Amino acid sequence: MDGKEFQALVEGARSYRRYSGEAVPREELLALIDAARFAPTGNNTQLLRFRAVGGKEDPAEARQVFSHLHWAAALKDWDGPEPGERPGGYIAVCLPTSVSSNPVRLLDVGIAAQTLSLAAASLGLGCCMVKSFDACLTGELGLDRKGYDIVLVLAVGPRGEKVVVEPADPDRGLAYWRDDEGVHHVPKLPLPSLLI
């Protein structure tokens, strides 16, 4: 992969919030986790743990996770994907309860999440990092009994919406938005405005 191909992969690894509704096989979720295990962590602690949820093997568990997620705060009139548009599986990113709010460990979570997202994009899958979820999800999946907290959930599935990256418009701001055709627009600042 050359630099242009990598740039295209990063640009394609957007937050997808609508999916085809097709379940993701557990082996594909595990392949994403396998990529994330190579991501760097502070002091090489490797404290992150992952839970592959739902997919073809457990649609009931996927519905359970979905019921605890809160989607797209910037889209005020949208309550999340409808049946038939929901993710095909999930990956819960977990930390030991004793360090689940440690800033360095949360950096590890972000690095792993981006790795998972890029791995999903490389397989043609959409992914969305969801931080807004009900705290009881950790207990419902039995992870609290193992001493872990869910700190991030990644929704994964075949893409079911068009996402367009476009130059930021100063009059519109940086919030993502949907047009009348349902196309999801993601404004991005130009490179010169990021350099200081």
Functional labels for PLM-detected ranges:
Residues M1-I196:
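Acidic, surface-exposed loops and disordered segments
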